[in-house]
């Protein structure tokens, strides 16, 4: 009998492998992305102190969204997290794609964050 691999379990393994090499510092924190079926979340994290510096998601009330699980929503979340990070004085980050492929919503969020002023 053939068993189908759980995509989320393989993503978590992939993320753990990447996280073993990636750490965010106060000077260059980690931009983490989490993608669910309904929403997308982004956090700028200082791993040394264990502190989330900035966050944004499609659940934020100040973002005017038509849908929460599309590329346009991911773009707005990327712009929002980048603006909030620049306001806090963070210009450079390490991008953590969370084990997801750099494609679609994850790519849209990353490119929007770059255009809004974050460097990675």
Curated annotation (Swiss-Prot):
One of its GO terms (molecular function) is structural constituent of ribosome. GO terms for cellular component: cytosolic large ribosomal subunit. Keywords: Ribonucleoprotein, Ribosomal protein, RNA-binding, rRNA-binding. GO terms for biological process: translation. InterPro entries: Ribosomal_uL18_bac-type, Ribosomal_uL18_bac/euk. Transmembrane segments: none annotated. It comes from the Bacteria. This is one of the proteins that bind and probably mediate the attachment of the 5S RNA into the large ribosomal subunit, where it forms part of the central protuberance. Part of the 50S ribosomal subunit; part of the 5S rRNA/L5/L18/L25 subcomplex. Contacts the 5S and 23S rRNAs. Belongs to the universal ribosomal protein uL18 family. This is Large ribosomal subunit protein uL18. It comes from Bacillus cereus (strain ATCC 14579 / DSM 31 / CCUG 7414 / JCM 2152 / NBRC 15305 / NCIMB 9373 / NCTC 2599 / NRRL B-3711). The gene is rplR.
